[in-house]
Amino acid sequence: MSSTRHGGNFQLELAAGTLLPKEMPGINAFTFYDYLLDLAQSGASPESVLSVEPIYHRLAYISRLVAWIDASGFSHGTLPRLFLSTEPPTAEQIKSNLSPSDIEQILFFVESETKQQVGCDLWKVLRQFLLTASTLKWVKNRPCSKPDWFKVNEFRNGGAGYARQAMAITFGLTNESCARKLIMTYVSGDLHRHQNDSGEFFRLDVGESDEDAFSCGLLLDKRSGMLGASMDMAVMRKDPETAAVAEIDVFEIKCRAKYTFCPENLMHPLSACYERMLDSPGEETIRDFLFGIRAPGVEYFPPDSVPSAAEALLTCAKGWASPDAKASTRDRGSLIEKRHLQLNREVRSTVYLFGEPCLKTNSIRPIVWPSGGTSCELPIFINPKHQNFKQIFVQTYVLADYYPDAKISQYLVTFIGRSRRANEFGRVLRLDGGREDLAEPISLDHIHAIPILLIKTPVVIDRDHFSDLSSLGKEAFEFSVKETWGNAADAAAAPRIGRGCAAKKPGPTELLCAPESTQH
């Protein structure tokens, strides 16, 4: 493990001995709910718990997890390095003994050790009983938590639409790294220039490889610890004179499985659209391709109307109108949605259209437009009613608290790719036509789809609406305490909430007893 993974002396020392494995069997047996339940069963009153800010309780819970990780042999000495204590401190002790800088280092450590996101056990357990964009709903005046957020959230097989959902998830997991490589090669001009200088970029990592470069783990809300966000890709730039963080670019990547097709299947409706788009690239043929499926990934709505929440991308350009489009007379949407629809309506997306791979050189590149550039702009903007916008909104809120003076630019990046032809299977494709300052070429793996379109959509956010989230963390903690103390009387007899929702409830000290040591 290279010491450049973590910027700064603290991270360099920490990384040497405590890089955590992605799989830690048993860690899901202790959630934030269990931390609160232990407090209730030990005789603490709700009033005493609520007298300490929720961020300190979240940190106390994390200290319990870290103690378990050390005791289980997954790391050594992480607890004293992070919390300056050989025993998990209480929320009161953390508030009294740790400085804001100490707390920030703990939160950045959590971020750095959860970069694999869904592939990381620590990420999974920390997201339990945590408000995220997916557990928020947006009502008329402000966001609030969904009724079912305070429970173990597990993805189960079966049910209507599962196969379709599983396909979309698999396509996304496989091709997010493909989109990341395209962003590095064509979209963000400074990403690779100083890769060996981690201080230029997002605080804790520049990525081990092109697969995970500039990836982000779980970043917790510094105010309450009750909200969290996991960004797909973030790039930080510092002021060369002051070394202060000046700019942060955040990319939320979405891979659209609904456009997957094989061009060898001439019966597929997208096959002909694809050929026309490559033969005559332009706004009209790109539009026809995007609208070439039953439920297009871009929704047209008339300028005097409001969109639905079905798709993340919108257009109200006259040339994109469909014959059956009708203006809605309903007053739909919350205040925050209406405000951001107004702000983003004039935004235009940057679109990269990729030609066919060259099998002689095993390479692929975007087409060159008459302007001489490798991209064009189209009248496509983000839908503030869609979950993707809300995800980006929460991410920006959480990140802005760490870097209040930095300029944060948000982008939704939509990747559309096709299945490989028979003669394309197994090929690693070099990305050509990108920046000339790359130290070495970036290539797509043999498992990646063949890129068709990469759509970069800027997202405009009104920070005045951050106040809508600022009180939500405290309210969520108060709700958590109320629910936990209400359940405490039955907790000993009921199945324990934790791994599998059926584990035996151990005592507080039992958690810290190591199982058979697992060395990594």
Swiss-Prot record:
Interacts with major DNA-binding protein; this interaction increases the nuclease processivity of the alkaline exonuclease. Its main location: host cell. Belongs to the herpesviridae alkaline nuclease family. This is Alkaline nuclease. Keywords: Endonuclease, Exonuclease, Host cytoplasm, Host nucleus, Host-virus interaction, Hydrolase, Nuclease. It comes from Psittacid herpesvirus 1 (isolate Amazon parrot/-/97-0001/1997). It is found in: Host nucleus; Host cytoplasm. Its EC number is 3.1.-.-. Plays a role in processing non linear or branched viral DNA intermediates in order to promote the production of mature packaged unit-length linear progeny viral DNA molecules. Exhibits endonuclease and exonuclease activities and accepts both double-stranded and single-stranded DNA as substrate. Exonuclease digestion of DNA is in the 5'-> 3' direction and the products are 5'-monophosphate nucleosides. Additionally, forms a recombinase with the major DNA-binding protein, which displays strand exchange activity. The record marks E176, D232, E252, K254 as: Required for function. Pfam families: Viral_alk_exo. Gene3D superfamilies: 3.90.320.10. GO terms for molecular function: DNA binding; endonuclease activity; exonuclease activity. GO terms for cellular component: host cell cytoplasm; host cell nucleus. It comes from the Viruses.
